[in-house]
Amino acid sequence: MAKQATMKNAALKQLTKDADEILHLIKVQLDNLTLPSCPLYEEVLDTQMFGLQKEVDFAVKLGLVDREDGKQIMLRLEKELSKLHEAFTLV
């Protein structure tokens, strides 16, 4: 049972790390490369979010992450990205 808890904790940490990496990638892209209205920005964002959602779905199916925890990871990332988008469009 302890091994399963360790695996669940590791899965949750990895998903959170991946979400943080997406946020960092988008920050770098906005800082250096493009504007939020650029199709490239939107494509990268959509692709990254899709990939993370698939990771979350897979972890949920394996029983490594509760569905609600997965939703919270996605929701937190969406909120952070929304704040970032607003900051760059208001400049």
From Swiss-Prot:
<comment type="subunit">
    <text>Homodimer.</text>
</comment>
<dbReference type="Pfam" id="PF07408">
    <property type="entry name" value="DUF1507"/>
</dbReference>
<protein>
    <recommendedName>
        <fullName>UPF0358 protein MW0995</fullName>
    </recommendedName>
</protein>
<comment type="similarity">
    <text>Belongs to the UPF0358 family.</text>
</comment>
<dbReference type="InterPro" id="IPR036270">
    <property type="entry name" value="UPF0358_sf"/>
</dbReference>
<dbReference type="InterPro" id="IPR009983">
    <property type="entry name" value="UPF0358"/>
</dbReference>
